Amino acid sequence: MRSLRLLPVLGAAALALAACSGGAPTPEATASSDDSQVPARPVVLNVYAAASLTETFGELETDFEAANPEVDVRFNFAGSQDLVTQLGEGADVDVLATANESTMKKAADAGQVDEQTIFVTNTLTLITTPGNPAGVTGLDSSLDGVKLVICAPEVPCGKLTKTLTDKLGVTLNPVSEEQAVTDVRGKVSSGQADAGIVYKTDALAEGDAVDTVEIQGADEAVNKYPIALVSASTKKDYGQKWIDLVLSTGGQAILEEAGFTPAAK
């Protein structure tokens, strides 16, 4: 019964407080309402980049957005061939970075990109599951009977794999061919495959999740990575700032630390 007697009193008190406030919003509420109507980063910069650039471009994003607080950098990391296909299908892209020149050339020939710049190079290596239980020693007979995964021939890492094996006179018998180098390393690190051929940068990015086996003669096949503004972009000023960061001393240092070779070297 005590609680029943308190309810009218509490209700009256609440009405009194409401009357005193006059229904006016508090300063905090007003500020919150205004803030919700203004995007924190009103400019979106869409960067389409080869899958092998995932870690390094993600690191560069922090520096770029700190220097350009009005910009939200959004990435699409995938196989270079897929990126160019999406661009041709009308995707909203401001900057394109591919893992080889021939794929970028397709976009250039279609008039989809402006002048391109080579910013890094990359080479291949073998990775195995931790401890290398299959006993892989290189592109040799140690791969016989091993579950080997490589990139599909239509994507840059796959083209480079074919170029290298042709030069070395090696024939591979992979159990699968993937559309992105990150898929190759994912199958090895998860134990779905015994070994895979990936870029040196991808092997480093996996850390202790894989073991690395050097490929003798890997330097005979090198991929050059070009970057370019997309011709239809309406944010070329910010796109150029992104490219400038990639080419800067700091940007090149981050890429080199990840295993890439700066184009100037």
Predicted features along the sequence, with ranges:
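Pocket-flanking alpha-helical
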Residues: Q81-Q112, G135
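Conserved beta-strand core positions
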Residues: L45, V71-V73, L124
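Short helix-capping segments at alpha-helix termini
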Residues: A66-V71, G169-T171
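Sec-dependent bacterial lipoprotein signal peptides
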Residues: M1-A18
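Short, high-confidence coil segments that cap the C-terminus of an alpha-helix
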Residues: E70, D92-V93, A193
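Exported/periplasmic ABC-transporter solute-binding proteins
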Residues: S3-L4, C20-L53, G58-T62, Q81, ...
